[in-house]
């Protein structure tokens, strides 16, 4: 009768208005075994945003980062993969932190993964278009964690998300 709490880091929404596509892909569960809550981990969703309607690239995005936890190790969601340069790709979402033991609270280890950075998609004259960065993974509220930073659309680091609220 063990109660589990899962935290999911979602990636950026996939959007291509010129094709009428407005959708989002949420995080996916990773494999876990055993009764320990620390082994339950959810990965970040796959980000993806077309910044322009004329895209010569593949349009694929960076994959979502996974979340992981094991034994006494520090618990992090892993970083979303960046998009491919030249393909107008968004970074993948950061992995959500797994349900974690409260013993890690305040240790600085309880953070969701950062979103992957978007990469330059097109350069026309002095204008450069970038894919969006992936969303940061969720932190565990029960362990006092915070969300990961969003990936910068220009390859920089995004602002930290506010700390998650209980529930």
Task: Name each model feature, range by range.
Residues 1-167:
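Low-complexity, glycine/proline-biased repetitive segments and flexible coils/loops
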